[in-house]
Amino acid sequence: EEICGTHLVEVNAPDRCLVRKVEVIKEPGAIPRDMEWVFVPLEIICRHYLSGSAWRRFQRGELTAEQLGVSEDCEYGTKLSKPFLEVTTKFEKFDRNISNEEALEISNITEEELNEIFSVVLKVDALIEREAAKNGLIHVDGKKEFALGPGRKVVLVDTFGTLDEDRWWDAEAYANG
């Protein structure tokens, strides 16, 4: 299923691959608008269940029930009515949740490019969810990173569907409470 390009050139061993180099510009707002093969200095988190840091922020009132599409009295692990997308910084000492407006400033990408990244995240997560369900798993949330490749098309430059990048729950255990 073709969702977007990647920087993968070839798998050259069972545990190695060759990828195309992308330029990394760490200075906020300094990426030229016409540059190709450039890393987008943002991390996109897609949440499907209320857990982890989102749960803690919800408890502190930093995220609202309305934002998340849940009831005020929901519990940890509640399935969200629709995926909840968040953007965090990439080159700060600690990842920091930011607004879409700040994301556009930091990355100097266009709103159209950011929306295309969001679209790709949702498509990748739908694929992960389908495959995980076949194996008795629930895909709770995950994070992804991107670059802009030829013609500034969105390119996935991160692993996904791994224990490092995604959170998983056992579907049977979840169903049993």
Which ranges hold each PLM region?
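A short glycine-rich, hydrophobically flanked beta-strand micro-motif that places a catalytic Asp/Glu
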Residues: G5-V9, A132-L148
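A structural signal for short, well-ordered beta-strand segments and their strand-loop junctions
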Residues: I45, H139-K143, L156
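Residues forming anionic-ligand binding surfaces in small-molecule and nucleic-acid pockets
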Residues: Y76-E111
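A long amphipathic alpha-helix within ATP-dependent nucleotide-binding catalytic cores
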Residues: I109-V140
